[in-house]
Amino acid sequence: PKPSSAASDVYKRQLQGYVTGAARMPFEEQMDRMTAYVRKINDWALCDSPCSGFKFVRKHREEVWAFLQPYLYSGEVFSQRFAVVMLLAHFVTDDFIDRVLEACAAVRPSGYYASMAVAWAVSVCFAKYPEKTRPLLAGGRLDDETQNKAIQKIVDSFRVAEWDKSWVRTLRRPKERKS
């Protein structure tokens, strides 16, 4: 069966993201195309897979880090998700881990999908850099929803030791009761 026009539009937009990441072109053109692509993201699937394919970022981390900052603090859920997914895909490295953790602490997610991206990023940071990530989790800088989802992702991870999982469980926050 032929896909619906809405599904076809999603596939076309996702393909634009993949092409932007894979095509050989000058860095400035890739950045222009990435900027145009961010405006089209209105779904997690349009964000997550294409972002991980933006391999050109690894040769231009400082420039891309600066480019992502307005998106992190934009207050727009999918712009925030884009920026956070870019951080976890390309910046969880020895050189950037401290900045990534600070960004995760400072961003105020504007909706569920942004919050889940921050939780995912924190869990990836913990799996790779547990000692550096502990202060963020213990310090109360994440909102309750993001904190608890990060903890759940860490506990579910196969890359985290059992004793770390036990420690992380102690940091769960009670859910607010709805009246």
Indicate where each model-derived feature is located.
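Amphipathic alpha-helical scaffolding segments comprising HEAT/armadillo-like alpha-solenoid repeats
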Residues: S5, M25-A36, K59-P70, D94-A106, ...
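Alpha-helix N-cap/helix-start positions at coil->helix boundaries
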Residues: D43-A45, V77-F78, Y112-Y113, D144-N148
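Glycine/small-residue-rich hydrophobic helix-like segments
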Residues: P109-D143
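Eukaryotic acidic, Ser/Thr-rich intrinsically disordered low-complexity regions
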Residues: P135-S179
